[in-house]
Regions:
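Conserved post-Walker A coupling segment in P-loop NTPases
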Residues: 1-60, 71-87, 152-157, 204
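Nucleotide-binding/hydrolysis machinery
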Residues: 5, 26-31, 107-117, 124-229, ...
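Conserved RecA-like P-loop NTPase ATPase core
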Residues: 13, 36, 50, 73, ...
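AAA+/SF3 P-loop NTPase mechanochemical coupling elements
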Residues: 34, 64-75, 79, 87-93, ...
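Short gly/ser/thr-rich secondary-structure transition/capping motifs
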Residues: 56-64, 100-105, 128
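Base-recognition residues in the alpha-helical recognition helix of bacterial helix-turn-helix
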Residues: 92, 96, 104, 275-279
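Bacterial C-terminal helix-turn-helix
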Residues: 236-281
């Protein structure tokens, strides 16, 4: 499948990572993945960045021609992040490329053909923007061939600990640490709402990895709003310390068991003996 995909979801859910994953598992994986943040580029620069320009095409352009991002993505994937931020004028120019698979460099006369796959992403409600005449309907249908809805992290509870462990592995390698997440820390991570989604979780794990002074990351190393996120009903006031820790550990192990589907795989991922799981079942 080489169709255009539209990734839909809140800011921070990991749309850019998913776009890269799609590219890396496509027939174009040996070619370039070229991202462009549509919300960070001004309309005056849009054409020259996307289409490139000929020498002396405008003031300050220089004497040499400069290929744009479309040519850089030829035979590869162009990722249009925050596509809902494009002005109507920019939308029209993008639509022309998608329809004709060709463009003209700024200051040029010859049409340049490209073979690209387009993946777009947005946190906007494009259907509502179409109704409000703020987004072109024809462009919307061009982009929305394969819509992929990415739920917020708070609706994917079973992903929180595996993602946290993934980020911890990354930062352990980056900083040459051997950090681990304590059951109490996992309990706090599971019960936080993560309004900033995967991006916030990644930043939280990096911060905790750096500031903790032991290899076992405790809630005290988390931001205060995350560390204090345990719901009261999860740990009754009458519960003793041992019971509370048992509940935390059980919740921690259950999360990995549900994620990997077997005690053996979950134990291998956590580098624990299977008996640690069995004594809770």
């Amino acid at each position: 499948v080489d169709s255009t995909a539209l990734l839909l979801g809140e800011t921070g859910v990991g749309k850019d990572e998913i776009a890269r994953f799609i590219h890396q598992n496509s027939g174009r994986s040996d070619r370039r993945f070229v991202p462009i943040n549509c919300g960070a580029i001004t309309e005056s620069l849009f054409e020259s960045e996307l289409f490139g320009h000929e020498g002396h095409a405008f003031t300050g352009a220089g004497s040499n021609a400069k290929p744009g991002l479309l040519e850089a993505a030829d035979h590869g994937t162009l990722f249009l992040d925050e596509v809902g931020e494009l002005s109507l004028n920019m939308q029209t120019k993008l639509l022309h490329v998608l329809q004709n698979r060709s463009f003209i460099r700024v200051g040029g006369n010859e049409s340049v053909r490209v073979d690209i796959r387009v993946i777009a992403a947005t946190n906007c409600d494009l259907e509502e923007m179409v109704r409000q005449k703020r987004f072109r309907e024809d462009l919307y249908y061009r982009l929305n061939v394969i819509p992929i809805h990415i739920p917020p992290l708070r609706e994917r509870k079973n992903d929180i600990i595996p993602l946290a462990q993934h980020f911890l592995d990354y930062y352990n390698q980056k900083y040459d640490f051997h950090r681990k997440l304590s059951p109490a820390t996992c309990f706090a991570l599971l019960n936080y709402r993560w309004e900033g989604n995967v991006r916030q979780l990644k930043n939280t794990i990096e911060q905790a990895t750096i500031i903790t002074d032991t290899d076992l990351i405790q809630p005290e190393s988390l931001p205060m709003n995350v560390a204090g996120s345990e719901p009261v009903q999860e740990v009754p006031a009458e519960a003793g310390l041992n019971e509370m820790l048992e509940r935390m550990e059980l919740r921690y192990l259950q999360t990995f068991y549900e994620r990997y589907g077997s005690i053996r795989k979950a134990a291998e991922r956590l580098k624990l003996p299977p008996t640690t799981f069995l004594r809770h079942w």
